[in-house]
Amino acid sequence: MKAGRLEGLQGVLRKGDFWGMKAYLDIETDRQGNVCVIGIFCEPGGFVQFYGDDVNAGNLEGILGRAETIVTFNGDSFDLPTLGRHLNLDLKGACYSLDLLKVKRSLGLRGGLKELEKTYGIKRKTAGMNGYKAILLWEKYVHTGRMGPLKLLLEYNKEDVLNLIRLEEILKEMENRGAAV
């Protein structure tokens, strides 16, 4: 992993393919704020998820070890600090961070991830899901052992991660044009 951190966002997306290998990351937490699911997409490895006891520093470092940039939505405020507390990892210090929430704000856009997905036609199988419902699904899985809630939670997390790729492309196009669409 590379030392350093992205501080400013002005012009970031004009640089094309920047900072080597990217990892797109999203986490889900339980009611107490403990990480229960991690979803990551990076080339060439593709998509991987960890949940339950497999959420650990070794697994995360194994996937992110070559990443130079971690792409998230609100990751600078939520995902990365939460992983730092839960797994004792300093991902902000180890990789560049591209938080698409900050990018969309710099473009004058409003709304959260799901609202932006709707605005720009990014589809979801898990439409209507949100972070609170994700917590409830995890609790149902833990208390009942039923796989249905876990499968839905994992699908929701996967869509959060994979939709970051398309959202980044859209924001990059907007940044290159110099105006919000």
Model-predicted regions and their roles:
Residues 1-19:
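N-terminal accessory regions of nucleic-acid-interacting proteins
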Residues 14-17, 31-35:
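Hydrophobic, well-ordered secondary-structure scaffolds
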Residues 19-30, 157:
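Two-metal-ion RNase H-like nuclease active-site motif
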Residues 26-30, 41, 74-76, 101:
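Anionic group-transfer/hydrolysis microenvironments
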Residues 32-33, 79-82, 165:
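Short catalytic/ligand-binding loop motif for oxyanion handling, primarily in non-cytosolic enzymes
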Residues 32-44:
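Short conserved beta-strand segments at catalytic cores or DNA/RNA-binding microdomains
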Residues 121-181:
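Acidic, Mg2+-coordinating catalytic module of metal-dependent nucleases/exonucleases
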